Amino acid sequence: MNITVHFEKEQTTKDILLTGTSVNDLLEQLKINPETVLVVRNKEVITEDEILSENDNLQILSVISGG
């Protein structure tokens, strides 16, 4: 399935041919640790087990932690 992903950290947008169906599949395909990002669809944060749909438009936001 085709989805569009905007990477906030790099300020880039890419069309991705996703081989799986979930957010977790997407993060694995992109080799991104799920603990370091938030995935947003339609201005809502979605979980790793959320099922994605054809032509979804997602944002991947970096999580910043500090002490």
Language-model region placement:
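Ubiquitin-like/PB1-type beta-grasp interaction modules and other compact soluble beta-rich domains
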Residues: 1-65
